Amino acid sequence: IGDALVNLGQKDLLIDTQGNWGDIRTGDRSAAPRYIEARLSQFALEVAFNKPITETSPSYDGRKDEPIALPMKFPLLLAQGAEGIAVGLSTKILPHNFNELLRSSIQILKEKPFKIFPDFQTGGLIDVTHYNNGKRGGKVRVRAHIDIVDKHTLKISSIPYNTTTTHLIDSIVKANNSGKLKVKNIEDNTAEEIEIIINLVK
């Protein structure tokens, strides 16, 4: 339950968080569950609870009723993203942009066409050439956003989905050790925004 709650809290949509909840950009883990606090966000209270249409069942001790499922007023699965695997089958639903989902939902209600593509908290560049509208067999390619500061300096300001700054820096170090790159040093200045400075050998 703790890991699932942290995963929800890091998406910054359903849970108002307090304490150290870790960082999906750097890969830093959250504090132990007893050291973090959570409450449902105002958004969650608005879209996740609709008493007239919510089916319930008795709680484990029979004293209260608890919801079997929460019918959403918002395409939460597309916003959060999800992945899973079973015997011979797997699925991966990539996260999408909150505002784009709202606009697309309005288009559906108006019975008008729309296009929507995945969007990631960590930023990065995405190639949706072979996305296939999210259907089976579709794929996307993501990469870091790299700016050339000068001929000896590169700056990374966003990273691919499911990659951390720590993992990215490790891969740069390995490339340097194998001779694919010639790096003088790497500065990780990531705080509120991602910033990795790569100083190349002159």
Role assignments for model-derived ranges:
Residues K139-K202:
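Gly/Lys-enriched N-terminal cap/neck module of very large, oligomeric protein machines
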Residues I1-K139:
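Catalytic phosphate-handling regions of large nucleic-acid enzymes and associated NTPases
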